[in-house]
Amino acid sequence: MFEVMPRFLPIDTYDAETPVLFINTQKELSEMAACAMHRFTVVRDLMDTLSSLNLKDTSDCDLTRVTRAVHLLAREGCAVLNVIQKRAVQREEGYKASI
């Protein structure tokens, strides 16, 4: 048997004592995948930019801002992927049970 996910699952971003951002776990999987993909595409693009910069000319403040953005987007993307994975496992278990 599988665990029932709450409809709205909080995303822990460490910026508030109580959650502010939530994932709607009942959205279409394709929409959730697109949401995660968008975040990881932005992360990839930011990392491409960082890899092409001459870091000796970059201020510590700017580098911190970019790495914080990458971290936040990656956390959100991973949270969405975790929901997708749980739903995929539930679907597979339901399929196996019906055979």
Task: For each feature predicted by the language model, list its residue ranges.
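Sequence/structural signature of long amphipathic alpha-helices
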Residues: 1-99
